């Protein structure tokens, strides 16, 4: 189910990612949730929500990486 605000994100996202990364996750999740409504568009199996979570985490990892227990921007800023 789409997230309307960062406050609605799962704890594993909201409590660990910086605000900007949460925004990226939420926007990517919502877009993917809409796109993968049709099961024929899901290439790795699983449900619509699982597919959207995979896409959202991939989007976060394009801009952030985990350094120890913190997520930091790839560009160091």
PLM feature spans:
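C-terminal alpha-helical interaction appendages
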Residues: 1-77
């Amino acid at each position: 189910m789409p997230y309307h605000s960062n406050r609605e994100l799962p704890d594993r996202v909201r409590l660990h990612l910086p605000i900007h990364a949460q925004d990226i996750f939420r926007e990517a999740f919502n877009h993917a949730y809409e796109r993968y409504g049709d099961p024929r568009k899901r290439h790795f199996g699983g449900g619509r929500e699982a597919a959207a979570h995979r896409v959202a985490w991939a989007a976060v990892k394009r801009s952030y990486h985990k350094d120890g227990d913190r997520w930091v921007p790839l560009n160091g800023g």
